[in-house]
């Protein structure tokens, strides 16, 4: 009984994102962000209950790590899942791979 109830209450991040997309985009814009894209397990559709939400966001000039951290906190509160936000101007092989798999929020 307990396992069945827990299973019924388990929600994947990909099930929540469409419902909160508009508000998330508003928060991103208010933080100086645009062109938000999802990557990782949520983008691939392989997320599970407890998975986090990974985003790449283009930040306007003058925004810094503090703005990024505040945005992460706001989005985590909104989605009720951990959210990691990567600035689109990041460099390296990992971010290049992430850009290729990312899909629009």
Which stretches of residues belong to each language-model region?
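Catalytic core of pol beta-like nucleotidyltransferases
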Residues: 1-35, 43-48, 59-105
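Amphipathic, hydrophobic secondary-structure cores in small proteins
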Residues: 53-58
